[in-house]
């Protein structure tokens, strides 16, 4: 459940997922040094605050596709409400994999979470997913969401510049 920074279960899961991802990573470990990675609680807080991600998928013909999307986290998966005519539905049906990029800031204050995993198209979702996502949509109705994507992350990486973390470079 994506509720607040205080959600210890979410923070623990995100921390474990990131640790496992970095333990299997190659060159990305150099690009994302340990002191620049978010902690589990930082990840939970960041993802609670950021309501939109850039979803990247592969079109049936192999070309890349990216589009912004509202997202929620529930039951260790990312949930994306989607219009029935959205290109990403056909993309995920053809290539059941999705990558999400959640970024903010510029230069010394930027932060990013990158996650990816298998995805599936669903016509219905648990009531909790719908209500959580409506809250994240500032109470806006999700009647337009005729389909949903559920992505179960296999990898998650984060990066946060020191200024984003509130740390001075000399500390």
How does the language model describe each region?
Residues 84-86, 96-101, 129-140:
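Short acidic (Asp/Glu) patches
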Residues 1-38, 108-171:
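Charged, gly/pro-rich active-site loop segments
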Residues 86-88, 165-166:
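Short, surface-exposed beta-strand-loop junctions and turns on beta-sheet-rich folds
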């Amino acid at each position: 459940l994506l509720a607040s920074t205080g959600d210890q279960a979410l923070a623990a899961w995100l921390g474990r997922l990131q640790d496992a991802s970095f333990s299997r990573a190659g060159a990305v470990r150099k690009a994302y040094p340990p002191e620049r990675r978010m902690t589990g609680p930082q990840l939970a807080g960041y993802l609670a605050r950021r309501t939109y991600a850039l979803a990247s998928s592969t079109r049936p013909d192999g070309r890349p596709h990216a589009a912004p999307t509202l997202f929620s986290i529930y039951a260790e998966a990312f949930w994306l409400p989607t219009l029935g005519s959205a290109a990403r539905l056909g993309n995920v049906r053809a290539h059941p994999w999705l990558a999400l990029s959640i970024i903010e800031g510029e230069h010394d204050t930027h932060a990013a979470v990158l996650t990816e995993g298998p995805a599936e198209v669903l016509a219905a979702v648990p009531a909790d997913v719908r209500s959580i996502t409506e809250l994240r949509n500032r109470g806006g109705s999700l009647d337009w969401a005729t389909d949903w994507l559920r992505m179960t992350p296999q990898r998650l990486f984060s990066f946060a510049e020191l200024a984003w973390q509130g740390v001075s470079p000399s500390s």
